[in-house]
Amino acid sequence: MTDTSSGFDELRTLIARHGTATPVAIGEAAVISRVEETGPPAFSTTGTVFVLMAQGEKRLAVGELVHVYGAEQSMIASVDLPITGHFTRASRREPALGFALTLRPALVAELLLHPAAGRLPRLSRGAPAPGITVGDPSVELVDAVLRMVRLIERPDDLAVLAPLVEREILWLLVRGPLGTAVRQLGLAESTVNRVGHAVQWIRDRYAEPLSIEELAEVAMMSPSAFHRSFQAVTAMSPIQFQKQLRLQEARVRLLADPRDVAGAAHAVGYESASQFSREYRRRFGASPLQDVAGLRQGAGAR
């Protein structure tokens, strides 16, 4: 067993050697990356994922809530959330070095069926775990991640050993201090999973009018309980969540065709172009045309 500092030292060496700005896969569910510039905030979605930052720092904004995780910290996203994120510490001399593992609910559920899971603390009946949590990894967790990353230099062993180490990482997450979020991901009837179904429903229909009653039915909850739970998990109301998706999709459309602001607004569900422009400016700090012009100019400079 390595101690935390030496484990991170080797992890940094391996990721610096093999990582690139485009994530490099290790088996089916894990990736490493090396990012050498901070860059502007960019929209993406989290997926359900465990991230271990070996070096650097990243800032994620989920609605009005901001999460920052840095060197030797971990982040868990138990719901696929829309975020605006960017690295705040990354350079050619000291790149951001990270490991990420997709959290697969079926594997988490399988671990929760093991007799050893019966000794885990019972989940609280209070508010659900937030969709994003940040914390410090244990020595055992860093060691397991290190053994996963070492497999990139052992291609003959990768297919056999990567699934075993993945299970170990998941188990350590389940029984660790941030385990509530991961355990809820594996329980079909958990609040996090129910909210996750509603999140996907909104994603698939973001341009349509939103009905809290219909969303509550999707989540199999009362409207009042659903609204509280959605806010607790996503840090946004359902309306705010939908607005985030609409504005980001409109931004993508305007980058492709900046001449048709009204068309982009209508395509993502806005009936009023003026309301769209007001909310766009509030979200991105500039009018649609000014924002897109700045993005295009920045892309051209790079």
Describe the predicted segments one by one.
Residues M1-I26, V31-S33, G39-P40, R125-P130, ...:
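A short, N-terminal "cap"/entry segment at the start of jelly-roll beta-barrel domains
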Residues T2-G7, V108-L172, T180, A198-Q200:
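Amphipathic alpha-helical segments enriched in hydrophobic/aromatic residues interleaved with Lys/Arg
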Residues T22-P121:
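N-terminal regulatory/effector-sensing and dimerization cores
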Residues R59, P209, P258-R259:
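Residue at a beta-strand N-cap/secondary-structure junction
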Residues E168, L172-L178, L185-L187, T191, ...:
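Basic/polar phosphate-binding segments, predominantly the helix-turn-helix DNA-binding elements
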Residues W201-R205, V252-A256:
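Short alpha-helical segment immediately N-terminal to, or the first helix within
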Residues A293-R302:
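Generic C-terminal helix-cap and adjacent flexible tail
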